[in-house]
Swiss-Prot record:
Domain called S1-like: residue spans: 1-72
Cited NCBIfam families: infA
Function text: One of the essential components for the initiation of protein synthesis. Stabilizes the binding of IF-2 and IF-3 on the 30S subunit to which N-formylmethionyl-tRNA(fMet) subsequently binds. Helps modulate mRNA selection, yielding the 30S pre-initiation complex (PIC). Upon addition of the 50S ribosomal subunit IF-1, IF-2 and IF-3 are released leaving the mature 70S translation initiation complex.
UniProt keyword annotation of Protein biosynthesis present: yes
Subcellular location field: Cytoplasm
InterPro entries per the UniProt record, alphabetical: NA-bd_OB-fold, RNA-binding_domain_S1_IF1, S1_domain, TIF_IF1
Name assigned to this protein: Translation initiation factor IF-1
Length: 72
């Protein structure tokens, strides 16, 4: 899958799950299961419930995503 094919949306982390997985409530109301991208993991970026995040979704499975950015 090419980088151009991803769908970027913003949301809020509502729950931290085991294995660096998070339940994210998107701005459009949907909930997705998201994991932390490699760059955030390498730089030890902490993600807590309530944080604003940017999530990349695959067009093939819109229920799972990758967290690529953390706001305040």
């Amino acid at each position: 899958m090419a980088k151009d094919d991803v769908i970027e949306v913003e949301g809020t982390v509502i729950e931290a799950l085991p294995n660096a997985m998070f339940q994210v409530q998107l701005d459009n109301g949907h909930k997705v299961l998201a994991h932390v991208s490699g760059k955030l993991r390498m730089n030890f970026i902490r993600i807590l419930p309530g944080d604003r995040v940017k999530v990349e979704l695959s067009p093939y499975d819109l229920t799972r995503g990758r967290i690529v950015w953390r706001g305040k």
